Amino acid sequence: MTNMAGTATTEFRWKSPPQPPSQEQPISDSDSDSGSDSENHQHRHNDLSNSIFEAYLDCHSSSSPSSIDLAKIQSFLASSSSGAVSCLICLERIKRTDPTWSCTSSCFAVFHLFCIQSWARQCLDLQAARAVTRPSSNPTEPEAVWNCPKCRSSYQKSKIPRRYLCYCGKEEDPPADNPWILPHSCGEVCERPLSNNCGHCCLLLCHPGPCASCPKLVKAKCFCGGVEDVRRCGHKQFSCGDVCERVLDCNIHNCREICHDGECPPCRERAVYKCSCGKVKEEKDCCERVFRCEASCENMLNCGKHVCERGCHAGECGLCPYQGKRSCPCGKRFYQGLSCDVVAPLCGGTCDKVLGCGYHRCPERCHRGPCLETCRIVVTKSCRCGVTKKQVPCHQELACERKCQRVRDCARHACRRRCCDGECPPCSEICGKKLRCRNHKCQSPCHQGPCAPCPIMVTISCACGETHFEVPCGTETNQKPPRCRKLCHITPLCRHGQNQKPHKCHYGACPPCRLLCDEEYPCGHKCKLRCHGPRPPPNREFILKPTKKMLHIQAESTPGSPCPRCPEPVWRPCVGHHLAAEKRMICSDRTQFACDNLCGNPLPCGNHYCSYFCHALDIRSSSLDKRSESCEKCDLRCQKERTPRCQHPCPRRCHPEDCPPCKTLVKRSCHCGAMVHAFECIYYNTMSEKDQMKARSCRGPCHRKLPNCTHLCPEICHPGQCPLPEKCGKKVVVRCKCLTLKKEWVCQDVQAAHRATGSDPKEVPKNQFGVGLLPCDSNCKSKLQVAESVLTQRNVKEIEEKEEPSGKNASKRRKRRGRGQDIQETTRLQKLAVTTKRILMVVMLVAMLAAVSYYGYKGLLWLSDWMNEVEEQRQKSRRYPRI
């Protein structure tokens, strides 16, 4: 016991933060998803977790922090080390370098320091605004407080965080550049007082979340007090497992329950008990042994004239209530020596007892029994809002029909209460605003200011659910499932079973078995392939919000594939009669085989030999007359060369005689490409080259454009290039540069003239062909001079009209007036003629437009038909390509 006591009071030394590993095994601090970075990150997380729980495990004598008290701390550590901690206010991820504040009341949620400061100021400002707008009836109002956004725990105004402290609150601005210390932690022992007020401090390293239960050893008694044992301070309340044996409230029986916490249950021992008056006997539980029957007492009182009017009771009935000092009902007149069986007379005065309203007295004469329940005296009353005054009976409340138009404390809805006294009740509507998580709406009563953050925490867990962490609602979309160190619980279905290498918990299908199949064939060999047996049903894929349909879908196992036929090589004899008859074959192939030699027997066609591999012969003979009946039949097409030679194969099967003449149609276009000729192959190939050229001519104009001019070749369809393109004899209209003079020249002269001017006739555009070859004469010059003089006069006249001053036009106006008199006036007939001409022009224009539209539509239809015909000809030419 001395050693135990010493253990209970031992002080634990401080644990230093874990040292980084050597340079041989560097651990990356990046967020990469690669395999090495993920393993290093997981390894570092394990080191941090082990270092935080090191002192606690030393004291707790456990190999892993698996107690229920540490589950919440492990969840905080998993989310913090994986970078999944998000601020509930701004829903942004909390980085290692961000100043933070954590609630120390109940939820231990982590927020950005700036966000919680802003949140606290908004809460206090809102309360101050409410206090200003609300009529203050209580001069001693409580001090304004602000609440934690998650657990709504209250904090005083002085508790607004001003500094960035670690989780345990000992160090200001904890280091953020040490990857071997938990973010926002000082790395030292927490030493915060534990919640059960045991007097001990937390032994974990500075950590998020609540402190674990006290692991120190203390002497403690069980619930019933019968057993004393040494227990952990955090779990010192225990049950010894024996019967409680504590005396119950009846002070007769003992508790028969197993050693338990709290008060003992009521005594349930049954027996026959009498009621309080002793007239009735009933079987009751011991805890209900004192009871009253429904009969009246009816015992004679001490006066001998009245009976007891009380119900069932214990003890004496007491004195007669009518004895002693007697008075009238209102209590103003007293009667001495009046017997208890004589009724006291009425005094005849006013009752004057205070009525239920508390202001007026009973106006009736002295009477027996209670006074009026309602005061009917008419008084002048004001309604609650003070707008209406009216004379009403005293017992009646006065309320007007006016609805309060003040805005409630939510600043969104009006009060709308009838006859409000100014103290408007809080808004009863639901806020209903969309929260920042974008998934839920605010369910709080309607309020001012920002809504509280969404209180729902989303659990991100591995496939087995053993490893998990919680994130605020709205931040789960970017989260990945944690890496679980537990082994996969899915049982393999292949024949190897437990011989497989175990793998860790995962989503989706299990990795395939890597062992060899080794299943034995009937021949005695074993399958050497990778395991291809059945695979167990896979876990569902990681989905944040699976639908009900997804949850009810049951994954099915994947059936395995059968082993292939035995691939082992063995020696088998040949079924033919060639040398080297044995051949190495697959064991599973039980059929007869042929060797690599061909049969070689001549076929009936006389052109080919049997191409079968070595096969069993019905008749063996080396002579050509006695051919084997088991050899193949020649189904090949004729492969002889035709005479005369052509590219078309003989359509007949292989035959010994000569091939028939080739009747295949051969498509050949004419020289100018205007039409296509079809010839029989035998007819076309027997002609000479000169006759072929002659037969291909279409006997029509060439229709090919000459290279040096815009005219077509006038020759009959001919092969090769068009002859003498520079000797074109077509007439061309030749003009001067001003297009005044024109003449007709022969095309070859026009080409020569263009060459003389230094331009190539091939490069001259069609609309400029022959323009500028004639020299301009005197008429062209005179016309040019006349046009220039007219243009000059017109310009001078316009300039003079612009320069005429506006003030010196009186005389000119007279001249213009005189000029205007010389102009003849138009008659009605002339106006009618002009109008008729205009109408006729409009009618002609409309008719022309209609004609153009009609014939244009017809032309488009004709063009479409022509293009279809051309397309059909092209398709036919593709079917029969030119040779």
Swiss-Prot record:
The chain crosses the membrane at residues 841-863. GO terms for biological process: protein ubiquitination; regulation of hydrogen peroxide metabolic process; response to salt stress; rhythmic process. Its main location: nucleus. Disruption phenotype: No obvious morphological alterations. Enhanced growth and survival under water or salt stress. Enhanced H(2)O(2) production. Elevated abscisic acid levels and reduced stomatal aperture. A zinc finger (RING-type) spans 87-152. It holds the Pfam family zf-NF-X1. Induction: Circadian-regulation with a peak of expression at or before dawn. Not regulated by biotic and abiotic stresses, by light and nutrient conditions or upon treatment with elicitors, chemicals, abscisic acid or phytohormones. A zinc finger (NF-X1-type) spans 198-216, 250-269, 303-322, 357-377, 410-429, 437-456, 494-515, 523-568, 605-636, 646-664, 709-738. It is a single-pass membrane protein. It is found in: Nucleus; Membrane. Residues 1-44, 798-824 are annotated as: Disordered. Pathway: Protein modification; protein ubiquitination. Residues 1-10 have a biased composition (Polar residues). One of its GO terms (molecular function) is zinc ion binding. Interacts with ADO1/ZTL. This is NF-X1-type zinc finger protein NFXL2.
